[in-house]
């Protein structure tokens, strides 16, 4: 019915309070997912094209570390470094966009990065796996036999096919980001 009842502390309806905070959560999740995808797609493609190289192994280890660290712990570490120690960014709070774009962005940087790193690390692994699958397809082998480089064959013939499983996983990850955004 959409009625969450009344707050025990303020005796106000909870529904408008939840809706006010939902806007903030959706902005945070949207920006974090965009940042996660913007980092995961090129890094995952690079990992697949450089599979089993020393550099790819180091980056893969970094993605495993990114997956292992919970977003709330990363958020605490980022606040300790960039807000408390260096004083570059605010430690908490929310500034609506109508109160100045600069302050709005400054207050979003740390939570967006904390959410995006964990999700981006997971998406990077999925992108790598999807691109590796595509690179072993017959149409990529044919393109390579016709003289295209691995990157060119992937760009022209394989990216659309590799994107399908990644976008599916990204959609599922949006739900986990809601939990992370609430905690952060």
PLM feature segments, named:
Residues 58-62:
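Membrane-interface segments at loop-to-transmembrane junctions
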Residues 1-16, 89:
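Short membrane-interfacial helix/loop motifs at transmembrane-helix boundaries
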Residues 8-10, 93, 131-133:
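Short, well-ordered turn and helix-capping elements at secondary-structure junctions
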Residues 71-98:
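Extracellular/periplasmic helix-loop junction at the C-terminal end of a transmembrane helix
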Residues 6-10, 97, 115:
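Pocket-edge positions in alpha/beta enzyme catalytic cores
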Residues 16-56, 71, 88, 98-184:
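Alpha-helical transmembrane segments of integral membrane proteins
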Residues 64-77, 173-174:
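Hydrophobic alpha-helical membrane-insertion segments
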């Amino acid at each position: 019915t959409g009625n969450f009842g009344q707050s025990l502390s303020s005796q106000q309806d909870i529904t408008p309070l939840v809706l006010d905070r939902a806007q903030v959560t959706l902005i945070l999740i949207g920006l974090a997912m965009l940042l996660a995808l913007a980092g995961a797609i090129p890094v995952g493609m690079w990992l697949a094209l450089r599979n089993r190289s020393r550099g790819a192994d180091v980056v893969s280890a970094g993605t495993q570390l990114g997956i292992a660290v919970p977003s709330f712990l990363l958020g605490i570490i980022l606040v300790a470094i960039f807000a408390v120690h260096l004083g570059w960014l605010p430690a908490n709070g929310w500034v609506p966009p109508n109160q100045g774009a600069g302050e709005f962005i400054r207050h979003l940087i740390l939570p967006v990065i904390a959410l995006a790193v964990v999700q981006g690390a997971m998406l990077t692994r999925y992108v790598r796996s999807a691109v590796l699958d595509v690179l072993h397809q017959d149409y990529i082998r044919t393109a390579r036999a016709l003289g295209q480089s691995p990157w060119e064959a992937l760009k022209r013939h394989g990216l659309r096919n590799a994107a399908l499983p990644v976008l599916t996983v990204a959609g599922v990850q949006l739900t986990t980001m809601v939990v992370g955004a609430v905690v952060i």
